[in-house]
Amino acid sequence: MIPVQNIYYMLSYAFQALQAQNYKNLATENFHNTAELCAAILDKGISIQLKRGLGRDYVPKSESLSTLQGKLNISESIKTQTLLKKQMICTYDEFSTNTQFNQIIKSTMLLLLKSNITNTRKKSLRNLLLFFSDVNEIDLRFVNWNQPYNRSNQSYQMLIGICYLIYNGLLQTQNDGTTKIMDFFDEQRMCRLYEKFLLEYYRKEHPELSANASQIAWQLDDSENQLLPKMQTDIMLSQGNNILIIDAKYYSHMTQQHYGTNTLHSNNLYQIFTYVKNKEFELRKLEHTVSGMLLYAQTDENVIPNNTYQMSGNQISVRALNLNQDFSGIAHTLDDIIQNSFNN
């Protein structure tokens, strides 16, 4: 089990806003589950946003009025017979806090009130909800989570990201159709967080490298590329023409068993080999080094991969990162990968 405190550190790299001074005290708090951690982040983040002021936008509103405002909705006025009362249905834009971002935050806070978090935290969230009295609750199943951000709403990006993790990583539907907030993120959400954490860690802690989630082009003999999938890397680290491609893996089992023998997951190995060989061919006319690594989140299995293979002229490594240790140990392992790959 990954300590909740380490999940906070992973989140702080995935969401750079969490490294601001306002959130520093969260690093020293003890959280008994991930739901409590997310609630604390939202609690702090919303409080900061309230000091700036809740975001506002022009929101369409329709109501019965005695004087014309905006556009007259004739058909609706006739249908509701408001004209008999010397009123009419008008549709206009209102500059309001009832925006979708605020609706997402309010709805997520209401979900957290049903979760296994402390009463103190619930009381704090209820106090914050008072500032959202003019904001509607929405069904988070139908939210478009990929909305663009601009200068006016940039401060919401981390808050909405945490709401997304709570809804998609902690909310679980029971057999009777009801929902329950789980204590810890599901495997799929932890996998995405693990990938994002690794990429952002290397971006921040190793600025001497270029760190990106780059695509690799298929090296084809002709122009036929129909139906070929994109080769999307998790992390590509480069320094000049020295390149390390890392494929981050967060599984319940790091190896597979075949007739009682542990082996690496075939698909994982085929994937990283394909990435490396296509990148190798792309740079064939330049002086370069391309290597690959499968970096598993370590489980409690007896077999822990720590292997390096030389395959057709390229180095492919398999490592395990122990997330169940003090974060300084995690950082040391990640830094050691750079030392061995770029400073030899």
Question: What are these regions, as identified by a protein language model?
Answer:
Residues M1-T179:
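Terminal, charged accessory segments of proteins
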Residues N144, M182-D183, G260:
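Short amphipathic alpha-helical segments at helix-loop
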Residues Y149-N153, T179-L198:
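A short, highly charged nucleic-acid-interacting micro-segment common to nuclease
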Residues E187-N344:
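Catalytic core segments in nucleotide and nucleic-acid processing enzymes
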